[in-house]
Amino acid sequence: MSDRAEDPAARAAQLREQLEYHAHRYYVLDAPEIPDAEYDRLFTELQALEAAHPGLRTPDSPTQRVIGAVLEGLSAVRHAVPMLSIKTETDTTPTGALKFDAAVRNALKLPPDAPPLRYAAELKFDGLAINLRYQAGRLVQAATRGDGETGEDVTHTVGTIESVPKQLRGITAPVLEVRGEVFMRRDDFEALNERQREAGLKTFVNPRNAAAGIVRQLDASIARQRPLSFFAYGLGDVQGWDVPPTHAGLLDALAALGLPVDAHRTVVEGGEALAAFHAGIAAERDALPFDIDGVVYKVDERALQQQLGFKSREPRWAVAHKYPAQEQSTQLAGIEIQVGRTGKLTPVAKLQPVFVGGTTVSNATLHNRFELRRKGIRIGDTVIVRRAGDVIPEVVGRVPVPRTAYIPNFRMPRACPVCGSQALRERGSVDYRCSGGLFCAAQRKQALLHFAGRRMMDIEGLGDKLVEQLVDGGIIRTLPELYRLGVAKLVALERMGDKSAANLVAALEASKATTLARFLFSLGIRHIGEATAKDLARHFGALDRVMDASVEQLLEVNDVGPVVAQSLRTFFDQPHNREVVEQLRAAGVHWDEHSGEADLTPRPLAGKTFVLTGTLPSLGREAAKELIEAAGGKVAGSVSKKTDYVVAGEEAGSKLEKAQALGVAVIDEAALRALLD
């Protein structure tokens, strides 16, 4: 009898080792040593062994990269270290690199004759940012960036990506979070779309959208069939691992652990060298096997990075230097009017589809009637389309060719195309707005979606399709009516089974406990963004004081000017708006209130720094943060010697351990409430 038959455990271990090695050679190093057929043979042999001996099947086996069960949904993941974005240099010429170098030297107060700084230069991948969490070298979680603080758990799909190692080499650190980009190579994208066309399915518009959609698939077996790639470029939470002193050294160290790192990275000295890197990559951009939308520069030395620090949550030591947006010409087939959440009527160009900036564009914004007139655009013209900011397509002008027939200028409608209400233009404004308010179905839909958003009332499961059914079916006409929805009414809608309906009802109930800032933001008041809502909540402390404040009192709030103050006053002067607010409160929507800064009373937590970890019994994290900040305290994302209190709930993680190690006071929700009293 052979050794293989005598010791299946040893053979299975050998096969796993071989498969991991060859997968790394193929997917990471792009230097395979065996043909595909041989890799498939080894894979099949391991599958057979594990089927015959189920006890040999391990979570990190190459055969377990597909998780067949369809998940109910993606759960939220709170990032231990926020996934912050970096600043974008708006000067897309090589001189943008010189501006960054000058800004860094100025921030470091370097004299003109000081030696040039060393920078790490790399590509800016056009994909989806991902955080990989390894514990003792084993992949335990993958999460999207989300809003920077909270992302989505996508371990089930990211685990199918062959270039993402499930086990790192030679590392036993308790925690190592690796950050990078998931993307789809152009040849993989073309092959995927070809398969979609052959199957009569919808094709993807660009590799980035394909990658994002695949990562967020609930069924991991679908992700397995749609190949993605990954490049590492940074770190998140790190415990028990010595981080190299330079960024270039970090990337080399990550590569040594078995993580894929792009080969185009380099280290240069001075701004001129950065500009040369920008120009060089631009020249070969179209020949790259994947899409990029720029390059990234980072000060190489970590000590200098720490010295430079952050500005408005963006590192001073890094910048994304983009390339000019791509432009194409196409025919303007027509103009339609889109009605926004606040009633704004926006002319939208209906275009002959054109591929521009990596996307097939058939609609583009025309902004307003004045822009239409200024650019001299009329239906039937050949126009120039650009993806503004590589995201929002816009018509930037017309190709100056003679028209063969008279075409009149486009005129904005005098009535809303959705509800027929009068369209009005405020004095001093270029925009026409529907006067129908929530009578207008288009505004109702957008108002409901805004109200339910993650940073507003956070009603999970209330998306576009469902809102469309609720409004078009006459089920919902006002915001408070959301809280009267029951399972019986929901199950009658398309794609709403008993479980989905019950989940939405539960989400509606959970959303009733909120914060004043979130509630103000959710109302969709013109000019009131998230930051202004927080400032109002902090200043006044109670909704009634906000609603009753005069323009003069509103102007006392940080960053509130005459336009914002008048917008607030106008909103709350409308009886129907106050009625909506009262109906929402009657439905059970509530939040904690306080005396507010306006009273100039001493605040009990002034000067104190808190860190939140785990799940609190009755307070959501945002609600707790709001209360602490309203009482004068500060909420930080990580524990340090400067932390005064760590508020720990159920399933508190590494922050609790670090607090205990540093001797920082650890309290629960009850103790926090006692401090607030």
UniProtKB/Swiss-Prot annotation:
Pfam families: BRCT, DNA_ligase_aden, DNA_ligase_OB, DNA_ligase_ZBD, HHH_2, HHH_5, Nlig-Ia. SUPFAM superfamilies: BRCT domain, DNA ligase/mRNA capping enzyme, catalytic domain, Nucleic acid-binding proteins, RuvA domain 2-like. NAD(+) binds at residues 36-40, 85-86, 122, 145, 181, 298, 322. Its EC number is 6.5.1.2. InterPro entries: BRCT_dom (IPR001357), BRCT_dom_sf (IPR036420), DisA/LigA_HHH (IPR041663), DNA_ligase (IPR001679), DNA_ligase_AS (IPR018239), DNA_ligase_CS (IPR033136), DNAligase_adenylation (IPR013839), DNAligase_N (IPR013840). Gene3D superfamilies: 5' to 3' exonuclease, C-terminal subdomain, 6.20.10.30, BRCT domain, DNA ligase/mRNA capping enzyme, Helix hairpin bin, Nucleic acid-binding proteins. One of its GO terms (biological process) is DNA repair. It comes from the Bacteria. It catalyses: NAD(+) + (deoxyribonucleotide)n-3'-hydroxyl + 5'-phospho-(deoxyribonucleotide)m = (deoxyribonucleotide)n+m + AMP + beta-nicotinamide D-nucleotide. One of its GO terms (cellular component) is cytosol. PANTHER family: CHROMOSOME TRANSMISSION FIDELITY FACTOR 18, DNA LIGASE. DNA ligase that catalyzes the formation of phosphodiester linkages between 5'-phosphoryl and 3'-hydroxyl groups in double-stranded DNA using NAD as a coenzyme and as the energy source for the reaction. It is essential for DNA replication and repair of damaged DNA. This is DNA ligase.
